Amino acid sequence: MLVIKMLFKYQIKTNKREELVDITPYIISAISESKVKDGIAVIYVPHTTAGITINENADPSVKHDIINFLSHLIPKNWNFTHLEGNSDAHIKSSLVGCSQTIIIKDGKPLLGTWQGIFFAEFDGPRRREFYVKIIGDK
């Protein structure tokens, strides 16, 4: 058995202060390039005002609802003690999380029919990066 470990770095430009950007094609590309058939992919964002999440990718209103609910739950102008203007983004990032792990089966991400992998931007627009670590066998 040959264990493969590869790290991929991607950069994206977000367009709004808060949005969910579909990064599923990047993950599929990393898995394909790694040639791993069975294993895991860890998707990680090294930012304190962004996150990674998995959710429905068929109906765009789901992305809208997630952003709206988080904004309702954590309003931008709440009474924060961290006063740099992006305090809400730090809390949203903590709730969403900075990584996701997915299973690779038969050379593809094991996702549900409607699932996609999203970069969650909470303090954009700006240039961002995320990493994909692939571990598995050919």
From Swiss-Prot:
Q: Which SUPFAM superfamilies match?
A: YjbQ-like
Q: Which Pfam families match?
A: UPF0047
Query: Which residues are listed as membrane-spanning?
Result: none
State the Gene3D superfamilies in the record.
YjbQ-like (2.60.120.460)
The domain of life for this entry's organism is: Archaea
| Protein family per UniProt | Belongs to the UPF0047 family.
* PANTHER family cross-referenced by the UniProt entry: UNCHARACTERIZED PROTEIN YJBQ-RELATED, UPF0047 PROTEIN C4A8.02C
Q: What is this protein called?
A: UPF0047 protein MJ1081
